[in-house]
Amino acid sequence: AQLVVEQHTVIIDRLAICRMDEKGVRSNGYLVTAWAGDRADACCIIHGYADGSIETPSRPALSASFYANSFLENGQNRYDLSRLATAMDSTGGGHANACGCRIQAPGVDANLETWLGMWANRDEELAIR
């Protein structure tokens, strides 16, 4: 998983985006945020398969997980990441610092575009006051 994180993670506007989809690898946010260090406030991990399903645990559906960077001082409870998880998937959720959802049509790139737009406006859309 470490190698996938190193090779398939980009940081955009302090959000580490790790593409584990189609790779048969999963991770939680600790590995990604530890790798990103102080360059990211949170991460988004994409995992699963485009042809996956919730009925096939060995080949799960595409999904995204969001995690606050708990390695940063005051890294948690700054942004409500569950707003990202529920933006397009009504069954998504979790809590402000760790949450997830299924990728919605038309696909990963469109979902990422929506989430990055929300993240770019995070002080208004996602900030916990």
Label each region the model flagged.
Residues 1-12:
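Hard-cation-handling environments
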